[in-house]
A protein has these predicted regions:
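C-terminal cap/linker of serine protease catalytic domains
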Residues: 1-18, 84-87, 158-227
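Conserved active-site neighborhood of the chymotrypsin/trypsin-like protease fold
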Residues: 35-117, 132-135, 144, 191-207
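Short beta->alpha transition motifs characteristic of CBS
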Residues: 42-47, 110, 119, 144, ...
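A residue-level detector for short acidic-glycine micro-motifs
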Residues: 34, 66-68, 110, 125-126, ...
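A conserved glycine-rich beta-strand in the N-terminal activation segment of trypsin-fold
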Residues: 16-38, 42, 60-63, 90, ...
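Catalytic nucleophile loop of clan PA
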Residues: 142-162
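Short, compositionally biased
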Residues: 119-130, 174
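Small-residue-enriched segments and motifs
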Residues: 30, 52, 62-65, 121, ...
Length: 227
């Protein structure tokens, strides 16, 4: 969907991450939306992978499978299936339902390298490419591998998900709005009654210094690997 003439997806091909996964040929980012092992990433990432692993900030790899994908918003839900994964009781952040204000500061975490990378910027437009109302335009430095990474505001709320960037315009990046996650779950419930995903509602990052927010968030942002 986002491989248009003026855009490119932000997954990274052909770069071998440091991982126990055998010869992965693609790398992106995802983050937990439920401590039982449910993550959000991009649909364009999931669609090109037959085998998917996710890696946490401790270097632990876990097998994951797609639960649901929505190509219209370029979002997908993954489920960690490895028995070695230990559920996390409570995530310290929440997912924002409402839109951001223009010029609101944001930051993102992702895996353009073999270690997590921080970037900061601001909301530059309330819509995405060609007026897409399901996305934002943000000004922030991202690189291949950032695709699927969380966009957060100063209160530590998830406000978006990195999807693509303009090839010929430095710093012009698009992010799916976090409200799409709620719509995604509604669709999942209609198709998979047995799934129980509880979105986080924590406020543990609010009021923290940015360095402390990032330290806490690192545990919940994963590298997405696969072939």
């Amino acid at each position: 969907k986002v491989d248009g003439i003026s855009q490119k997806v932000l997954g990274e091909q052909g770069i071998p991450p440091v991982s126990t996964v055998t010869d992965p040929d693609y790398r992106a980012t995802g983050f937990l939306i439920d401590g039982k092992g449910y993550l959000v990433t991009n649909a364009h990432v999931v669609n090109r992978l037959k085998t998917i692993f996710v890696e946490n900030n401790k270097g632990e790899d876990f097998r994951a499978v797609p639960v649901y994908t929505d190509n219209n918003t370029d979002l997908a839900i993954l489920k960690i299936t490895d028995e070695s994964f230990k559920a996390i009781p409570a995530l310290p952040y929440s997912i924002r339902r409402n839109n951001l204000d223009l010029a609101e500061p944001i930051f993102t975490l992702g895996f353009p390298r073999n270690e997590i990378v921080y970037g900061e910027g601001y909301l530059s437009a309330k819509s995405g490419n060609s007026g897409d109302s399901t996305a934002y335009q943000v000004t922030v430095s991202v690189n291949p591998g950032n695709s699927g990474g969380p966009v957060m505001n100063r209160n530590g709320e998830i406000v978006g998900i990195i999807t693509s960037k303009e090839k010929n315009a430095d710093g012009v990046v698009y992010a799916a709005k976090s409200a799409n996650i709620f719509k995604l779950l509604d669709a999942v419930k209609k198709s998979e009654d047995s799934l129980s995903i509880k979105l986080p509602s924590g406020s543990g990052l609010k009021g923290m210094e940015r360095t402390q927010q990032v330290k806490k968030m690192e545990e919940y942002v994963f590298m997405v690997l696969g072939n």
